[in-house]
């Protein structure tokens, strides 16, 4: 091999050298741009995500759109999406999607409680969420007045908004007269009518146990049921608190002496046990014999004639000590009492003169 050939061989790179040099050649321009674009896209997505999160948090904490309290009823079994849409439709929150997503992220979606809520004005979606988690539902009131008949009380229970179900007897419940405690009862939307009826019945039983245990000695009746019967008569005879014990004392005296009670409300109940009698009693009514006519029959009638309140129960268990045997209306909402029939007749005559004067306008 000539010197020229050796020189050419030295100056010509080998295949191995060419491969090594080609492997260190700079990457094509297009690949670098792809990497940069991907990195820019990731940065953009992160920025957008953070922006959306910041907006969502701001929206979740912002004041609500309502300008006054809003009442909403959330049904049992409703999912978070349905609840969120209902709140948005009612004007409680601005966006249902923000509320639904926030409750899911905070893992409180399944903690939202059904019921009736009164959401304050302009509260944030976050505040609404916590109200629903705590179950701060509306507490309703149902007032059963003393002196109502059981049928009237049942009508009020059936008409009470938010209560559910029927009022069939059974399961320990009684629809008998005088077995319910007339008070103001609290309940929440969705409570059953049977439950509130049971509470009234249990309240009456507990009250009677307590009051009966503290009763005065030597009363002319032997059972709690008899006490309720007499208390119901007192309840219907007078609405004045300071008269109850006095009226009870008169009836206790008459029972001890074997006299007829001669109570108009008992006669009226016998004529119309399912609703108040819608007319005045006549002389014929007083002479019509039935189990509740205490003008015709001695002793207590067979059942209460109304729902007696606690005060009337206490009055018959602690009657006023008196010699009075009679009373009649005095024209002012109260009564005038007498020990003798002669005195009573004079009081009745005064009452009738007053009635005539009122009827004729004083002429």
Question: Where in this protein do the model-derived segments appear?
Answer:
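N-terminal type II signal-anchor transmembrane helix
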Residues: 21-69
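Short N-terminal micro-motifs specific to bacterial/archaeal maturation
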Residues: 28-31, 71-74, 90, 119, ...
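Short, flexible segments with low predicted structural confidence
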Residues: 54-56, 125-126, 284-285, 315-316
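Bacterial extracytoplasmic/cell-wall-associated proteins, especially those involved in peptidoglycan
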Residues: 79, 155-164, 171-363
């Amino acid at each position: 091999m000539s010197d020229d050939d050796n020189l050419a061989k030295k100056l010509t790179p080998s295949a191995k050298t060419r491969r090594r040099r080609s492997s260190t050649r700079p990457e094509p321009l297009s690949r670098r741009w792809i990497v940069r674009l991907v990195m820019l896209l990731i940065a953009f997505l992160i920025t957008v995500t953070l922006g959306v999160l910041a907006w969502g948090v701001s929206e979740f904490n912002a004041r609500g759109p309502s300008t006054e309290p809003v009442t909403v009823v959330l049904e049992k079994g409703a999912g978070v999406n349905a609840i969120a849409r209902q709140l948005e439709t009612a004007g409680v929150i601005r966006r249902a999607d923000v509320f639904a997503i926030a409750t899911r992220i905070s893992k409180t979606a399944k903690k939202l409680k059904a019921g009736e809520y009164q959401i304050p004005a302009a509260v944030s979606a976050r505040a609404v969420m916590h109200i629903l988690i705590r179950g701060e539902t509306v507490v309703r009131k149902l007032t059963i007045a003393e002196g109502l008949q059981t049928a009237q009380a049942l009508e009020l229970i059936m008409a009470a908004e938010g209560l559910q179900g029927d009022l069939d007897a059974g399961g320990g419940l009684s629809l008998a007269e005088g077995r319910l405690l007339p008070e103001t009862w609290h309940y929440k939307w969705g409570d059953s009518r049977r439950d509130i009826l049971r509470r009234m019945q249990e309240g009456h039983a507990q009250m009677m146990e307590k009051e009966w245990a503290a009763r005065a000695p030597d009363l002319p009746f032997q059972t709690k049921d008899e006490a309720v019967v007499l208390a119901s008569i007192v309840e219907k005879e007078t609405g004045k608190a300071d008269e109850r014990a006095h009226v009870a004392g008169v009836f206790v005296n008459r029972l001890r002496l074997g006299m007829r009670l001669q109570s108009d409300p008992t006669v009226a109940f016998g004529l119309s046990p399912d609703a108040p009698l819608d007319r005045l009693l006549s002389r014929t009514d007083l002479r019509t014999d039935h189990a509740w006519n205490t003008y015709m029959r001695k002793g207590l009638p067979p059942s209460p004639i109304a729902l007696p309140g606690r005060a009337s129960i206490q009055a018959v268990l602690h009657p006023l000590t008196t010699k009075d045997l009679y009373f009649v209306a005095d024209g002012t909402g109260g009564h005038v009492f007498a020990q003798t029939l002669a005195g009573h007749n004079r009081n009745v005559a005064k009452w009738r003169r007053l009635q005539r004067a009122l009827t004729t306008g004083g002429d």
